From Swiss-Prot:
<keyword id="KW-0963">Cytoplasm</keyword>
<comment type="pathway">
    <text>Metabolic intermediate biosynthesis; chorismate biosynthesis; chorismate from D-erythrose 4-phosphate and phosphoenolpyruvate: step 5/7.</text>
</comment>
<keyword id="KW-0460">Magnesium</keyword>
<dbReference type="GO" id="GO:0005829">
    <property type="term" value="C:cytosol"/>
</dbReference>
<dbReference type="InterPro" id="IPR023000">
    <property type="entry name" value="Shikimate_kinase_CS"/>
</dbReference>
<dbReference type="GO" id="GO:0005524">
    <property type="term" value="F:ATP binding"/>
</dbReference>
<keyword id="KW-0067">ATP-binding</keyword>
<dbReference type="InterPro" id="IPR031322">
    <property type="entry name" value="Shikimate/glucono_kinase"/>
</dbReference>
<keyword id="KW-0808">Transferase</keyword>
<comment type="subunit">
    <text>Monomer.</text>
</comment>
<keyword id="KW-0418">Kinase</keyword>
<keyword id="KW-0057">Aromatic amino acid biosynthesis</keyword>
<dbReference type="Pfam" id="PF01202">
    <property type="entry name" value="SKI"/>
</dbReference>
<comment type="function">
    <text>Catalyzes the specific phosphorylation of the 3-hydroxyl group of shikimic acid using ATP as a cosubstrate.</text>
</comment>
<keyword id="KW-0547">Nucleotide-binding</keyword>
<feature type="binding site">
    <location>
        <position position="136"/>
    </location>
    <ligand>
        <name>substrate</name>
    </ligand>
</feature>
<keyword id="KW-0028">Amino-acid biosynthesis</keyword>
Length: 171
């Protein structure tokens, strides 16, 4: 069976929903950011701080390559995984790519006081979210299916992911 690949902006519920979907479908679950942290033996924030975004993206590419080889997995990706088109090509080989989108104020609310978001360590995080969303929006269009999670519960999103997967894996 094909993998279920969850993409989308940070704090849209990819990991939380991914774990729920994996349990429901009896799939494995993997988070590419956690893979990167294991590879580097440090947090994503520390990687950004110590080595910068370019180094992080190299590690991310390696993690995606590894994750894409798996079968029967839900793969939650980092918010910027779409910035490298080869990542999406890799993930699509054996996966259905589902993108989560949300309004900026929902993303900001979900992030809350979480300090583990290196790209948002700025004076005006909501403005930064809007800017990043605008930059990434064209890349998110490469998904097989998009879900606006803004007004949905975790259970509703998980159900929508499963329905979309069942429809799309046939194609």
């Amino acid at each position: 069976m094909k993998n279920i690949v969850l993409t989308g902006f940070m704090a849209t519920g990819k990991t939380t929903v991914g774990k729920k979907v994996a349990t429901t479908m009896s799939f494995g679950f993997i988070d590419t950011d956690k893979m990167i942290e294991k590879m580097a033996n440090m947090t994503v924030s520390d990687i950004f701080e110590k080595y910068g975004e370019n180094y992080f993206r190299k590690l991310e590419k390696a993690a995606v390559k590894k994750a894409a080889r798996l079968k029967n997995f839900v793969i939650a990706t980092g918010g910027g995984v779409v910035l490298n088109p080869s990542n999406i090509v890799q993930l699509r080989k054996n996966g259905v790519v589902i993108c989560f989108v949300a309004r900026p104020e929902i993303i900001l609310r979900n992030i809350g006081k979480n300090k583990d978001r290196p790209l948002l360590m700025v004076d005006n995080p909501e403005e930064k979210i809007r800017q990043l969303l605008k930059e990434r929006e064209p890349f998110y269009r490469f998904a097989d299916y998009t879900i606006d999670v803004s007004d949905m519960t975790i259970d509703e999103v998980a159900e929508e992911v499963i329905k979309a997967y069942i429809r799309l894996k046939k194609g």
